[in-house]
Curated annotation (Swiss-Prot):
This is Aspartokinase 3, chloroplastic. Keywords: Amino-acid biosynthesis, ATP-binding, Chloroplast, Kinase, Nucleotide-binding, Plastid, Repeat, Threonine biosynthesis, Transferase, Transit peptide. Substrate binds at residue 204. GO terms for biological process: lysine biosynthetic process via diaminopimelate; threonine biosynthetic process. Allosterically inhibited by lysine, but not by S-adenosyl-L-methionine (SAM). K(0.5) for lysine in the presence of physiological concentrations of substrates is 7.4 uM. No inhibition by threonine or leucine and no activation or inhibition by alanine, cysteine, isoleucine, serine, valine, methionine, glutamine, asparagine, glutamic acid or arginine.
């Protein structure tokens, strides 16, 4: 035995030879000895082996032992190497070389974190790419290199590379590919939805390559990944694809596998995926980088998902509408999803689902003000004193009033109405019904980028007029009151008093099944004034104290 173990550089311990004979074997190592017990032998081997790990198999009992000199240090190193969180940065956070340098400093200021970094395209790049595509349709192949937006994109990214001190070679292939794609669009004289998705993907592909190259330059090992190459698998709904369940195991296998081999910080493109049938590049809709971040967080089972924006977290209303907007310290996933869906630009509407399913907290922070506490989004929070969390405005909404006496005592009427929308591919936002009528709003984000909008609306009216009287109302806005709807009586009483005082007429009201949202429909030209008045009433007075002073029966009646 001693000879066998010494062959591997192990100083053998003294063994007691007064017990039964046990046969031991390991890969490349065979020996037998008389020992008092496997446990005593293992301790002795541990002291002798130092940093050498031995896997010892006892044929009598099949006991496997893995011994190391410093087990605590080993455990610590294992913890340090584990990916801990996702850090997602939007376009304004990486808008220039200066901003990228600040983001790198921010990431490295958390030495205990081993993040997956998700980046959007540099600010304005996506819009410039789309404008370049539209111009390429009619400019002719020979004039593509004169497109102003193409020149802007080239100059921005080359300048950024120089200012970061990295080689322009990291983006040269993509700049060349972008120009060739635009020439193809010019030759075909059309920009399909599939081509549009491929076109805008160049923004994220270049920003992540520049950022990863900079991290490597300053001595922090990083590796760039295109989301469509690491397993983000989507439907083939170009410009607004949905992520499929097959994504999670694929992403986990790729990122964790690479991380275990090289410990390079992953820098991943947001917003992008790969169609499961077409294998073409798809996009997740505007703001889709948030969804990329939460999807990766769930796939890897990380501790936290951080979404870094240019505002101090989720606010009580849009600061562009009212400068008195305040940060919201805590939200539930349900509240955040409603906020995003009804117009809050700080989060993608679908981004909360993976986080909720994985029960992973989402923290919204300001990359321009990293010391601000931001907003923490979790499954639940203390709602005992909560009244209103935020006020959200969605403009340019179309409203339909559908009236028919056929609804009385009949079944299947609503099914006929909604099958019409399904057939035409139009999404419904808010619904309210009575005995003989339905009022609903149409989601502008689902069809505002498509041509023939009026034609589609005319089709809706034509189909519905076969079964009802239809009134189409344009230029409406949805004002959503997100909060504790168990306080709905108080919220509505106070809200309608404010609106009546300001002469604003509510044309429709709906309380969502989510129990965190009350939606009001008003005219577009009254919407901003409405938000300001409601914000002043709910957030600039002691609303919580007023609620606590209400009679118990009054509160109970609202639940």
């Amino acid at each position: 035995m001693a000879a066998s173990m010494q062959f591997y550089g192990v100083k053998t311990p003294e063994l007691a030879l007064n017990s039964k004979r046990i046969e031991f074997s390991s890969k490349g190592l065979n020996f037998s000895a008389l020992v008092s017990s496997a446990r005593v032998f293992s301790r002795n081997v541990d002291r002798s082996c130092k940093n050498i790990a031995l896997r010892v198999t006892c044929e009598a009992g099949r006991v496997e032992l893995l011994e190391r000199k410093a087990s605590e240090t080993f455990k610590l190193n294992k913890t340090e190497k584990k990916l801990t969180c996702v850090m997602k940065f939007g376009g304004s956070s990486v808008a220039s070389a200066e901003r990228m340098i600040q983001v790198a400093k921010l990431i490295l200021s958390f030495p205990d974190e081993k993040p997956v970094v998700v980046l959007s395209a540099m600010a304005k790049t996506t819009n410039k790419l789309l404008m370049a595509g539209e111009k390429a349709v009619c400019c002719g192949v020979t004039n593509v290199d004169t497109i102003e937006e193409l020149s802007y994109i080239k100059e921005l990214h080359i300048r950024t590379a120089h200012e970061l001190g990295v080689e322009t070679a990291v983006i040269a292939e993509h700049l060349e590919g972008l120009e060739q794609l635009l020439k193809g669009v010019a030759m075909m004289k059309e920009l399909t939805l599939r081509s549009r998705d491929y076109l805008v993907s160049f923004g994220e592909c270049m920003s992540t390559r520049l950022f990863a190259a900079y991290l490597n330059k300053i001595g922090h090992k990083a590796r760039q990944y295109d989301a469509f190459e690491i397993g983000i698998i989507t439907t083939d709904d170009f410009t607004n694809a949905d992520i499929l369940e097959a994504t999670y195991p694929a992403v986990s296998k790729k990122l964790l596998g690479d991380w275990s081999k090289e410990n390079a910080l992953p820098v991943v493109t947001g917003f992008l995926g790969k169609g499961w049938r077409s294998c073409a590049v798809t996009t997740l809709g505007r703001g889709g980088s948030d969804l990329t971040a939460t999807t990766i967080g769930k796939a890897l089972g990380l501790r936290e998902i951080q979404v870094w924006k240019d505002v101090d977290g989720v606010l009580t209303c849009d600061p562009n509408i009212y400068c008195g907007a305040q940060p919201v310290p805590h939200l539930t996933f349900d509240e955040a999803a409603e906020l995003a869906y009804f117009g809050a630009q700080v989060l993608h509407p679908l981004s909360m689902r993976p986080a909720r399913e994985g029960n992973i907290p989402v923290r919204v922070k300001n990359s321009y003000n990293p010391t601000a506490p931001g907003t923490v989004i979790t499954r639940s929070r203390d709602m005992s004193k909560a009244v209103l969390t935020s006020i959200v405005l969605k403009r340019n909404v179309t409203m339909l009033d559908i009236t028919s006496t056929r609804m009385l005592g009949q079944y299947g009427f609503l099914a006929k109405v909604f099958s019409t929308f399904e057939k035409l591919g139009i999404s419904v936002d808010v619904v309210a019904t009575s005995e003989v009528s339905i009022s609903l709003t149409l989601d502008p984000s689902k069809f505002c980028s498509r041509e023939l909008i009026q034609h589609e609306l005319d089709q809706v009216v034509e189909e519905l007029e076969k079964i009802a009287v239809v009134n189409l109302l344009r230029h409406r806005s949805i004002i959503s009151l997100i909060g504790n709807v168990q306080r709905s009586s108080f919220i509505l009483e106070k809200g309608f008093r404010v609106l009546r005082t300001n002469g604003i007429n509510v044309q429709m009201i709906s309380q969502g099944a989510s129990k965190v949202n009350i939606s009001l429909i008003v005219n577009d030209d009254e919407a901003e004034h409405c938000v300001k008045a409601l914000h002043s009433a709910f957030f600039e007075t002691d609303t919580c104290e007023a609620v606590s002073e209400c009679p118990t029966g009054y509160i109970a009646a609202s639940s």
